[in-house]
């Protein structure tokens, strides 16, 4: 168990008055968690301090070689005023999988969860009260060695910051338009596609901007070898309901193993759906749309939760989905998952963790 030193701010920030205008990741709570790592000593100096900048040398490793990872989680306020997390142990384990791939030291999962809970408890007044809003939690770790040599660092900093946030997409739960990217790729076998590291997201920005210029909300990535099979959307995993069955890319190293994805697959199987995790060609998706068999498409992720898709655009061909409306299964998944997260529905799966 961590011995966390807490230093509370003497100048608390003014909290947002209108939670309908929170946006995503633009406002930050009063405090942050910090912990440092030194080779031979391990993790030490766990602390919660007032939120603010810290000084770093221009030659710090992370600036040059991108040895960093992060996670994305949320804290929810129930109608009874209780605060709870959603499957934080899954985030802790995925964080360590990312750390291993980037040659960084792991954090014991119980310490990771303890740190998150401690910070949320200190800043519990920052957890929004309004329906659909939550406290977004961003744990991250960076290499803090100073020097330009290319090697695994011997010093790291683990930090957690929190941001009260509303809907991730400006459209809210309205169905979005997705552009299928067939020039740029997000990941390839043997690389870092399954991790949450900044490089994956940096490499996706250009394609995302080009898609936005064309009026699309996100990019759907194809596999990096044949540029043929669907993998994931920029900030989401993605699922297709075709002729009553659910298809999604398998987590074989190029797709992020999403916590929301995992939860939705468990829900779907519990409801009797056949879920097929494997290769799905974009050509087969478009053919299913032409034949009227593509019933629903939806993205899944911590930030967006469930995001319905109304249109796929690939090589000038357009697949219109669900008549541009939210499909019934998509709506049921959203209502069920958010119901559990916000404490409106019974958590029979044991997914929520109280912050007390």
Named regions from a protein language model:
Residues 128-138, 142:
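Extended, Lys/Arg-enriched charged tracts that mediate electrostatic binding to polyanionic substrates
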Residues 1-119, 140, 147-356:
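Helix-start/capping segments and mature chain N-termini
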């Amino acid at each position: 168990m961590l011995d966390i030193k807490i230093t509370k701010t003497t100048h608390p920030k003014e909290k947002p008055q209108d939670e309908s205008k929170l946006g995503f990741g633009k406002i930050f709570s009063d405090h942050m968690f910090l912990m440092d790592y030194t080779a031979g000593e391990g993790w030490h100096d766990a602390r919660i301090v007032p939120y603010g900048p810290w000084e770093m040398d221009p030659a710090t490793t992370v600036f040059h070689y991108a040895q960093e990872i992060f996670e994305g989680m949320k804290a929810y306020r129930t109608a009874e005023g209780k605060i709870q997390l959603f499957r934080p142990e899954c985030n802790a384990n995925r964080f360590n999988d990312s750390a291993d791939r980037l040659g960084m030291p792991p954090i014991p999962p119980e310490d990771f969860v303890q740190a998150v809970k401690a910070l949320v408890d200190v800043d519990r007044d920052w957890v929004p009260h309004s329906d659909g809003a939550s406290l977004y939690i961003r744990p991250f770790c960076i290499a803090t060695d100073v020097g330009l040599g290319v090697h695994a660092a011997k010093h790291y900093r683990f930090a957690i910051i929190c941001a009260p946030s509303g809907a991730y997409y400006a459209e809210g739960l309205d169905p979005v338009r997705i552009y299928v990217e067939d020039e740029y790729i997000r990941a390839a076998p043997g690389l870092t596609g399954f991790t949450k590291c900044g490089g994956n997201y940096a490499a996706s920005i250009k394609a995302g901007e080009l898609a936005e210029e064309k009026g699309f909300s996100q990019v759907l990535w194809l596999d990096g070898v044949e540029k043929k099979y669907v993998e994931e959307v920029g900030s989401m995993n993605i699922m297709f309901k075709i002729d009553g069955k659910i298809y999604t890319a398998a987590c074989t190293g190029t797709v992020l193993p999403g916590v929301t994805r995992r939860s939705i697959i468990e829900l779907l199987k519990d409801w009797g759906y056949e879920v097929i995790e494997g290769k799905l060609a974009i050509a087969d998706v478009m053919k299913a749309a032409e034949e009227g068999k593509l019933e629903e498409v939806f993205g899944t992720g911590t930030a967006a939760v469930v995001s319905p898709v109304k249109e796929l655009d690939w090589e000038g061909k357009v697949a219109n989905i669900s008549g541009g409306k939210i499909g019934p299964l998509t709506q049921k998944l959203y209502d069920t998952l958010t119901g559990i997260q916000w404490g409106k529905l019974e958590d029979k799966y044991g997914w929520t963790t109280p912050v007390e």
